[in-house]
Amino acid sequence: VSYISSLTLKVADLERFITGWNDSGKEASLRVANDVWASQAIMAGERAGEISVIYHWDSIDAAMDGVVALRNDPGILKTLSDSGSETVRRVLVRVDAERGGRNGKYVTLLTSISDPIAPEAQTAAVDRVWEVVSRHGGNGQMWGQILAGGPMTGTYILATTADSLDTLLEGTAEIMASTEQQQYFADHNATLTGRTMSRRLE
């Protein structure tokens, strides 16, 4: 088990944010977090345009201490100020499973609610879904649950990275049409609550 914290921002000057991120923000983040990457929501309803910065941690304590350290980093503070960035939310996610890598031009995020899922049932679902996704251009997937996130607490998430969303969504359609997936939803009283499509910021 590992954890991620997701910082969501509204950014007035995206070019300045990206410049600051590349000049110092990413490097400063990697001094305290295991991994970090940023994305911009493109197809996301009322969230369109928001920036998300994803930090990977070994523990909740590391996430708590790391966030405090990053909020006091002079370079990061300057980037946030210069780009007119405003914090929208920060959530903590328990990562239950990962497949593949984290690289890709795009990121999709599916959210759902359901009854509690036994580890063995989740592992079987992860492997079944990844087998299809990996054949349709998926570079990697991360499954988890929001542990602290206001009204989103308890929500399950599935993040997928890919270089083509057209190809990826063909795989998603195959999964959703399968009897196995429909049975999984029925067994766990699961309901999809949202999907966002984002581009990675480099």
What annotation goes with each model-predicted range?
Residues 1-202:
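Short S/T/G/P-rich N-terminal loop/turn motif that feeds into the first structured element of a domain
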